[in-house]
Amino acid sequence: TGYGTDGTIWGGEILLADFDGFRRIGSIEPFLQAGGDLSAKEGWRIAVSLIWQISESKDEAMQIIRKLGLCEEKEAKVQLAMLERKINAVESTSAGRLFDGISAILGIRKKSSFEGEASMALEFAAEAYEKRSGEKKINVLDGQKCLTESADDGRELLQTSRLVRAAVEVVSNIGENAVAEDTFDQDLIEKAAYEFHKGLAEQIVTACIHAKEKTGCRTAALSG
């Protein structure tokens, strides 16, 4: 994660590169990263931003935040105000922060005491479901079924907001009382963590297949 050539925070990019340079041809959907350095440590802040992005109004966002028990009401109002007015908020396509936000939404980790803690906990939850359920590895061809769209600059956007909505729906369906008492149905949460990883992987595969079709490049290198 770091600042990209356009002054926004990058970290979930698909780059076409050679020894002479690179071109950004895809990314996860942008969201606002509000709260400065705290947003990198407190995943609930990213979760608030992701929820605000998929909501039709600030009231709807507040209702979801309250139902999920993400933070104190006062904190949520301050965070939403920053997002609405773009105060101390920068556009971001950081995959790491997306993972932190999903981890907070699912009630796995709302804050991190070290870099990557929330994302690691999300991964462990997904692995627990995979081991318990006997789910097989993802069939890469499934990626063709995922939807992507084009950004104004022509790059392909992975529709990560669909994954956010799915995570919110899982926790919302568990029930308000369970969230308030921190008694999440562990099986459902672990399955949701697995489905997030699977869904994102399928979207990445889709974008890579499209990139190969457009550019002829057949080599994919993963980093991060």
Predicted region positions:
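Phosphate/diphosphate-binding loops
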Residues: 1-55
